[in-house]
């Protein structure tokens, strides 16, 4: 595992909290290892994305979104990763980026700038990582 740790995609965070069996065993093991080391990151953009998905009635949580975020982000070893100007700019400069989705671009930029491995099931991001643009792990 990278010394810098892991950043998890929004859907991975949702799965981790509600459907952990959807995660492959290698991803689950790496997430647990990163959490024990205090190197498990969730982007604040994932908080925003979950809030938007709830507001648009595209997902339902088992509790109000504010409470869900509070509880889910209290996972031992998990830290919130903010969006700093360098990440925002990097997201506009991703070489051959596979996504126009702003949250995915910000997650990829965060992983690149902080030398993190992005845990995702997004096939476009995984293929992008295989091209050497960032480190990724299949969820």
Regions found by a protein language model. Give the residues of each.
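Alpha-helix capping/helix-boundary segments
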Residues: 12, 46, 87, 107, ...
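Acidic, PIN/NYN-like endoribonuclease modules and their adjacent C-terminal/linker elements
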Residues: 1, 108-139
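Acidic catalytic patch
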Residues: 69-96
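Short active-site oxyanion
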Residues: 37-40, 58, 77-79, 113-117
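Donor nucleotide-sugar recognition loop
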Residues: 97-103
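Short, well-structured N-terminal submotif of metal-dependent ribonuclease cores
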Residues: 1-42, 56-70, 123, 137-139
